[in-house]
């Protein structure tokens, strides 16, 4: 794993001409704006300027590259908030900044030190730098920060100080009606604000004061030192921009000498043409710090105090040598808590070897008590090697840990070819340490991963990660057909690789790589894929382990370029068919190229060999392929607004909030959340006074016991097996799917007149919704019956390797006191249900392989029992119930999972209210219908 340079300083404020990185995060870009549009990226711009790409110096000796450049907004967020200087008082000896935030007299530092401050705030600078600059205080010239020059060497300085005479009395000569520009009148500098800034009214720090002209007879022209193209950065060491220059100059009390600090135009131009020196490589833990924020050191310390370990052991010991710990090929971390687990490794080796000989099956997991704390251990054996991962039971359930170790083994094979190649090479140890550092922080501190996200988003991501992070699929975002067509066209053009330098006719030689496929992500969602299922899952699991999708979700990526050789299982596994007429994979090498830009992330799988040239040695990323992938992302700049509209739209299918179904007193009505889904359908109509769409308490509706479906009413396959689900103390598991109807929960509701109209009853909606709106409502309502009772869902399509579930925006609309706990219980329960499904699928596959089914096909085996269904009934009540005279209201809901073995393997998990009988097949049909890539 290559190190992570945070290269925010590479981008000059004005940007290099033709450099794609200079165009990042252009919020003022408008296709119809001739000024802003003139700087848009073109694929041939880098060729015309012959500039080295900014990531070139970060390529490692083995050809790997991991280059991450923060977006401009992210750089600003990492800096401590410092207000712009608006008012100063000039005197002969000092400049006094009159701001409340400057009580200690600390002056606002110039922008050239912004990147240094980022590194210092993230504690990424060496200690000697902090010591060297610890004594700096007071307003000093920017020139004093420059390094000492050698004698006899003439250097064009980047900054220069120019002293001019300023006379504010000139203002009395100007006409009263004329708009004063103090920069022109007092200093004699003409600065023309960009038209795009004037049009959008962009505020904030303002733009840089570039000298576009000099006023004849002005002080700047008389000095002879100010040139057109210089940039005014400070007045008497007070930073100025177009936003505050007029206010700063207005504070000059009378005629006096003023020091102006400029960035030298000639030096800046010369600097851009000089070859860049090798940048200092930062530690790979910088990605950890970027993801977990300023509290990363405290988080890491808490994790080290928690017992957890990963070990790679060998079962073949050399009896002649008695070397201590010779069976340990790799272990992480090195801490007191993990040392105790490491000391009992002999137990794990004995269990793995002995039980396999006795039972004939491999050990998958075990549990032990360490300091009265239960620790789960997961096993993964290959040949004579054993991979072990141990985590606390209170943090990671056992079914989740089994899935996690499978993902780890799969990812390491994808990156290194085999587990032996990963763990048995000394040069891989630092990379593995970084890999497992991210792994354990994701497992033990999931809520801290999204440090900049809202609390509700953090809670949803943490609760859903139990299930979603280990599903054999990628999170899919359904989009309108016209958007899908644009995305498919863009990826197809890239994959064709028959234009410009990618064409074999361009250089009259065989192309370097063949593009096997690509997949496009937006804000962490898969929106388009042209990859086979196995390749898609391999790449998605790699991105998940390195937390790349959360970075793109919050526009933290200014530019991301990743390049490495990979070993996809789909292409490297030997073919089972010996027929020569069947297609055989070429003996080639495979490379993964990932390019990120703002919210987009495009993953491309390349093949060297076969139709393309053979790769020799450890090739690094080719600039032409990187530029073409960037160009594809730039072509999609206009699509993101429509994707955001889809994310901000009403949930499809419609969801309900659990708090709306609470059966309680009239006083609890005020605490219910307004339904955003139905409010969109109501539009301009007014059903009642604001708020218009509150959930009534079913006061006119008697809740009946849910009737179990035939598959849920009994039988050997109907029960919920496996481990229990960790639930809230306020949530009780009322009835398993195998329970009888007599033990079901009966909710009794006092009948009284409804305080507000029931928005879920179509009888009330018919008066206010048009026929078209009713059609829309019925189309997006997933459940059957007159009322929408669906709370949450997850649908897994294993053939295509995707799953769909409500987006973060959709879940954020359904806030409440009970709903977040319902979502947490849903994912934990689905994890246990899916563990049962995995056993069922394994048994079916084993039957087919053993020849018990003569046809050898999965379809005929599954036709005897095509559907498996498991469900749990929950009852929950509000946590903080203050009314001692009345019992807290109770709400019952089902979590049901259904496994489809025919015609293709699919899984559906739904959570809905207990009041209405649901048909899971109907819901599955609606959800899966038209779900194609």
Swiss-Prot record:
**What are the alphabetically sorted keywords of the record?**
Cell projection, Cilium biogenesis/degradation, Cytoplasm, Cytoskeleton, Developmental protein, Phosphoprotein
Domain PDZ, chain residue ranges per copy: 186-264
One GO MF annotation is: phosphatidylinositol binding
Q: Which coarse location class describes where this protein primarily resides?
A: cytoplasm
Q: Name one GO cellular component term.
A: cell surface
Point out the coiled-coil segments of this chain. none
The listed locations are: Cytoplasm; Cell surface; Cytoplasm, Cytoskeleton, Cilium basal body; Cytoplasm, Cytoskeleton, Microtubule organizing center, Centrosome, Centriole
Q: Tell me, what is an example of a GO biological process annotation in this record?
A: nervous system development
**Disulfide bridge positions per record:** none
Q: Looking at the record, which segments are called Disordered?
A: 1-54, 703-742
- Locate the compositionally biased regions of type Polar residues: 37-48, 729-738
Which residues, renumbered to this chain, carry the PTM Phosphoserine? 675
- Which ranges are annotated Low complexity under compositional bias? 710-719
Q: Which domain of life is it from?
A: Eukaryota
Q: Which Gene3D superfamilies match?
A: 2.30.42.10
Q: How does it assemble?
A: Component of the CPLANE (ciliogenesis and planar polarity effectors) complex, composed of INTU, FUZ and WDPCP. Interacts with CPLANE1. Interacts with NPHP4 and DAAM1; INTU is mediating the interaction between NPHP4 and DAAM1.
* Its job: Plays a key role in ciliogenesis and embryonic development. Regulator of cilia formation by controlling the organization of the apical actin cytoskeleton and the positioning of the basal bodies at the apical cell surface, which in turn is essential for the normal orientation of elongating ciliary microtubules. Plays a key role in definition of cell polarity via its role in ciliogenesis but not via conversion extension. Has an indirect effect on hedgehog signaling.
Belongs to which family? Answer: Belongs to the inturned family.
Q: What is this protein called?
A: Protein inturned
Task: Give the organism the record lists.
Answer: Bos taurus (Bovine)
Q: Which gene encodes it?
A: INTU
């Amino acid at each position: 794993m290559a190190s992570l340079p945070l290269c925010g300083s590479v981008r000059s404020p004005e940007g290099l001409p033709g450099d794609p990185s200079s165009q990042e995060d252009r919020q003022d870009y408008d296709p119809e704006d001739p000024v802003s549009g003139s700087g848009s990226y073109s694929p041939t711009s880098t060729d015309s300027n012959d500039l080295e790409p900014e990531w070139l110096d970060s390529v490692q000796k083995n050809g790997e590259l991991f280059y991450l450049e923060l977006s401009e907004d992210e750089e600003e967020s990492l800096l401590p908030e410092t207000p712009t200087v608006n008012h100063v008082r000039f005197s002969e000896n000092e400049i006094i900044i009159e701001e409340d935030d400057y009580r200690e007299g600390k002056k606002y530092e110039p922008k050239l030190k912004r990147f240094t401050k980022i590194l210092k705030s993230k504690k990424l600078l060496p200690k000697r730098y902090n010591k060297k600059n610890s004594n700096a205080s007071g307003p000093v010239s920017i020139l004093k920060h420059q390094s000492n020059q050698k004698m006899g060497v003439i250097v064009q300085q980047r900054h220069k100080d120019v002293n001019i005479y300023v006379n504010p009395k000139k203002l009395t000569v100007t006409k009263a009606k004329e708009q004063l520009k103090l920069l022109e009148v007092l200093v004699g500098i003409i600065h023309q604000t960009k038209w795009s800034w004037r049009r959008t009214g962009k505020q904030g720090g303002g733009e840089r004061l570039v000298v576009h002209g000099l006023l004849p007879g002005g002080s700047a022209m008389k000095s002879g030192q100010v040139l057109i193209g210089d940039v005014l950065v400070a007045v008497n060491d007070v930073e100025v921009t177009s936003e505050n220059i007029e206010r700063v100059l207005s504070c000059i009390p009378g005629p006096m000498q003023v020091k102006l600090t400029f960035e030298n135009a000639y030096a800046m131009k010369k600097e851009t043409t000089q070859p860049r020196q090798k940048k200092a490589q930062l530690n790979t833990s910088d990605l950890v710090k970027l993801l977990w924020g300023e509290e990363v050191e405290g988080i890491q310390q808490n994790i080290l105090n928690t017992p957890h370990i990963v070990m790679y052991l060998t079962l073949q010991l050399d009896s002649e040598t008695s070397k201590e710990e010779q069976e340990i090929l790799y272990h992480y971390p090195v801490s007191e808590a993990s040392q105790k687990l490491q000391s009992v490794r002999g137990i794990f080796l004995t269990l793995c070897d002995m039980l396999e000989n006795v039972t004939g099956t491999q050990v998958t997991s075990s549990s032990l008590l360490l300091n009265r704390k239960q620790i789960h251990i997961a096993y993964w054996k290959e040949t004579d090697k054993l991979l072990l991962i141990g985590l606390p039971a209170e943090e990671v359930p056992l079914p989740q840990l089994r899935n996690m170790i499978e993902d780890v083994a799969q990812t390491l094979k994808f990156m290194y070819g085999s587990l032996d190649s990963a763990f048995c090479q000394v040069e891989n140890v630092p990379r593995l340490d970084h890999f497992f550092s991210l792994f354990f922080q994701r497992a033990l501190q999931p809520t801290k991963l999204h440090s900049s996200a809202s609390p509700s988003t953090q809670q949803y991501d943490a609760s859903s990660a139990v299930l979603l992070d280990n599903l054999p699929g990628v999170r899919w975002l359904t989009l309108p057909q016209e958007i899908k067509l644009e995305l498919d066209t863009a990826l197809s053009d890239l994959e064709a690789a028959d234009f410009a330098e990618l064409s074999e006719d361009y250089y009259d030689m065989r192309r370097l790589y063949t593009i096997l496929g690509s997949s496009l992500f937006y804000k962490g969602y898969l929106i388009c894929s042209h990859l086979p299922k196995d390749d898609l899952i391999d790449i998605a699991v790699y991105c998940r382990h390195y937390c790349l999708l959360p970075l793109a979700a919050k526009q933290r990526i200014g530019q991301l370029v990743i390049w490495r050789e990979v070993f996809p299982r789909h292409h490297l596994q030997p073919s089972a068919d010996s027929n020569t007429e069947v297609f055989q994979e070429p003996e080639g090498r495979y490379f993964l190229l990932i390019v990120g830009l703002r919210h987009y992330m495009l993953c491309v799988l390349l093949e060297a060999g076969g139709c393309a040239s053979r790769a020799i040695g450890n090739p690094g990323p080719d600039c032409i392929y990187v530029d073409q992938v960037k160009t594809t992302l730039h072509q999609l700049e206009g699509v993101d607004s429509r994707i955001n509209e889809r994310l901000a739209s009403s949930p499809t299918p419609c969801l309900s909030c659990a708090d709306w179904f609470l059966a309680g007193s009239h006083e609890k009505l005020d605490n219910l959340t307004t339904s955003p889904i139905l409010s969109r359908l109501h539009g301009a109509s007014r059903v009642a006074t604001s708020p218009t769409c509150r959930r009534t308490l079913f006061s006119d509706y008697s809740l009946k016991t849910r009737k179990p479906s035939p598959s849920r009413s009994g039988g050997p396959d109907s029960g919920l097996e496996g481990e229990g689900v960790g639930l809230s103390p306020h949530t009780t598991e009322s009835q398993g799917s195998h329970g009888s109807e007599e033990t079901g929960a009966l909710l009794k509701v006092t009948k009284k007149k409804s305080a507000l109209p029931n928005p879920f009853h179509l009888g009330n909606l018919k008066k206010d919704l048009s026929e078209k709106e009713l059609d829309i409502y019925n189309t997006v309502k997933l459940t059957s019956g007159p009322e929408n009772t669906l709370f949450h869902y997850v649908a897994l399509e294993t053939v295509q390797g995707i799953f769909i579930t409500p987006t973060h925006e959709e879940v954020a609309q359904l806030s409440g006191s009970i709903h977040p706990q319902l979502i947490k219980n849903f994912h934990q329960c689905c994890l246990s249900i899916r563990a049962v499904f995995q056993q069922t699928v394994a048994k079916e596959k084993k039957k087919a392989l053993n020849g018990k089914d003569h046809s050898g096909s999965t379809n005929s085996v599954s036709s005897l029992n095509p559907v498996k269904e498991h469900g749990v009934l929950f009852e929950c009540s509000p946590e903080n119930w203050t009314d001692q005279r009345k019992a807290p209201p109770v709400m019952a809901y089902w979590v049901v999972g259904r496994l489809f073995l025919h015609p293709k393997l699919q899984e559906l998990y739904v959570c809905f209210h207990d009041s209405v009988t649901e048909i899971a097949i109907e819901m599955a049909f609606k959800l899966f219908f038209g779900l194609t890539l």
